[in-house]
Curated annotation (Swiss-Prot):
This is Intermediate capsid protein VP6. It comes from the Viruses. It holds the Pfam family Rota_Capsid_VP6. Zn(2+) binds at H153.
Length: 397
């Protein structure tokens, strides 16, 4: 993996900097590195593909070295270099696609394609010029079963979940009380509602709670907490739990009271925030517990009192909500990230070449299913293919 990264980094630099008119002295170190790569690769044969519709390709390396010059690089020099660069880029691209198409239930962190296994040999270590990538560093750590630490911005840590629970209901569905939520990606939105606006509740107050368990521990997280859940601020028709009928939800939004958010690790509270909104932080956690209250307004103007009558029918439904969004965090496991293209790159390659469903990844790389059942085998394989995708992204956009 280190060799593949070094190849890609060298080729990217060569493609960007070995251009007509450039002073040789400005790129002499890069050309020496490029020649070292050629010397190491010459005389070796590789094969890629042969899975799904990814065609089998044979690669033979027998290239001349780039020479020296006292002046600027001319057109002939650059054309010779480009021929070599393009062949190497095509090779790296195919090795990456071959690797992304493969998976294994055992030791999925290790190279799975024949080409990358061969590149892992001792004879190619002379190409190991640079391993400064976060993915490469953490792949090396995970390969040695040591602690990793990926920094994600908007990590897709929450499997998609859109549902509700009813604490009070009846067949007519005309006086409900409960909680509705939407968890997805890096965001939680939860709303508590009461058709009667806590009319007969103790102290005219309804208490709501929403608990979310993460599939992996997050650390040093920066989080935004807002006293609103905009996705639950408009009327909708909701299917009943048994699917036999539907019920009407017509929210009127109130501000939540006594808001508390707790971040827990192995059942122990690590951080707690009460009535604090905006930017908050959490040290390390695997569970989030949100609690908040809906209080019937003690003093209401006639217009507000008309919204919340003292008897049925309850046409308008009192609603309070919260939004919690993880803006950035560190995780020991690799995750999809809204700011990165790794998941999209891997999925597109597997779809384009009709890679058959294997023993590890779900069909279509379904992220909700993958993160819901995030086994060690999936974690190993995902870290490997995301690392390869990061390498490929240097050369292929």
């Amino acid at each position: 993996m280190d060799v593949l990264f070094s190849l890609s980094k060298t080729l990217k630099d060569a493609r960007d900097k070995i251009v007509e008119g450039t002073l040789y002295s400005n790129v002499s170190d890069l050309i020496q590195q490029f020649n070292q790569m050629i010397v190491t690769m010459n005389g070796n044969d590789f094969q890629t593909g042969g899975i799904g519709n990814l065609p089998v390709r044979n690669w033979n390396f027998d290239f001349g070295l780039l020479g020296t010059t006292l002046l600027n690089l001319d057109a002939n020099y650059v054309e010779t270099a480009r021929t070599t660069i393009n062949y190497f880029v095509d090779f790296v691209d195919n090795v990456c696609m071959d690797e992304m198409a493969r998976e294994s239930q055992r030791n999925g962190i290790a190279p799975q394609s024949d080409a990358l296994r061969k590149l892992s040999g001792i004879r190619f270590k002379r190409i190991n010029f640079d391993n400064s990538s976060e993915y490469i560093e953490n792949w090396n750590l995970q390969n040695r079963r040591q602690r990793t630490g990926f920094t994600f911005h908007k990590p897709n840590i929450f499997p998609y979940s859109f549902s509700f629970t009813l604490n009070r209901s009846q067949p007519q569905h005309d006086n409900l009380m409960g909680t509705m939520w939407l968890n997805a990606g890096s965001e939680i939105q939860v709303a508590g509602f009461d058709y009667s606006c806590a009319l007969n509740a103790p102290a005219n107050t309804q208490q709501f709670e929403h608990i979310v368990q993460l599939r992996r521990v997050l650390t040093t997280a920066t989080i935004t907490l807002l006293p609103d859940a905009e996705r639950f601020g408009f009327p909708r028709v909701v299917n009943s739990a048994d699917g036999a009928t539907t019920w009407y939800f017509n929210p009127v939004v109130l501000r939540p009271n006594n808001v508390e958010v707790e971040f827990l690790l192995n059942g122990q509270i690590i951080n707690t925030y009460q009535a604090r909104f905006g930017t908050i932080t959490a040290r390390n956690f695997d569970t989030i517990r949100l609690s908040f209250q809906l209080m019937r307004p003690p003093n209401m103007t006639p217009a507000v009192a008309a919204l919340f009558p003292n008897a049925q029918p309850f046409v308008h439904h009192a609603t309070v909500g919260l939004t919690l969004r993880i803006d950035s965090a560190v995780c020991e496991s690799v995750l999809a990230d809204a700011n990165e293209t790794m998941l999209a790159n891997v999925t597109s390659v597997r779809q384009e070449y009709a890679v058959p469903v294997g023993p590890v990844f779900p069909p279509g790389m379904n992220w909700t299913e993958l993160i819901t059942n995030y086994s060690p085998s999936r974690e190993d394989n995902l870290q490997r293919v995301f690392t390869v995708a990061s390498i490929r992204s240097m050369l292929v956009k």
